[in-house]
Amino acid sequence: VLMRLVGMRPVVVHGGGPQITALMERLGKKSEFVNGLRVTDAETVEIARMVLKGEVNPQLVAAINVHGNYAVGVSGVDGGLIRAEARDPELGFVGDVTEINPEVINGLLDDEFIPVIATIGSDETGQAYNINADTAAGAIAEALGAEKLIYLTDIEGLRRDVADAATLIRRTTADELDALVADGIIAGGMIPKIDSCTHAVRNGVKGGHILDGRVAHVLLLELFTDDGIGTMIENTGTEQMGTRP
């Protein structure tokens, strides 16, 4: 809300992995992941849709609206916001983004609302797909020509050694991250986040940030201080290098 009040146009994109897993467990269904992506059969995609649109999205909207009635919840299905196709038959109904309809988002932004987007997309037949929230966020940032792509997670940022807080990477480039993935330093569920972020900064988004969403005022500390508090990712080269803002 503060970002909106100071003239920014924030867009919130969310998943709901832990909540989906919890409901699947209650239903006696096992979760399976491949390279950080949830294998999604027909039943699982319906569970994902129910959790994202029926639980997580309205909770986030309500939390924002405590501070003013600014947030509006939508899903990628609404207005053809996120068009998708199957990524890999072995993953089932896991979608790759094929197209973003920015008019849906820009319409809300122009009316001074904060869009809160659940990452369920659909193809032209109406088939729903579970889309990794990091992947969707990157595609949306590119489509909007966003200045920043910010990931709030449960780690302080990227580390060269996950067990050593002193190895936190404060600033890096897309090429350097490619090398860290190739060397196996970045793995698992972090891969979709890094892939989408590097793609975004190579396609017009000026900076990506990986932050610990559990830290109070983390966005202000990252964006409005020279050193920041997490990891900042930019395109290769020094022409974009500067202070955090």
Where in this protein do the model-derived segments appear?
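Nucleotide/pyrophosphate-binding catalytic subdomain
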Residues: 1-214, 221-223, 227, 235-245
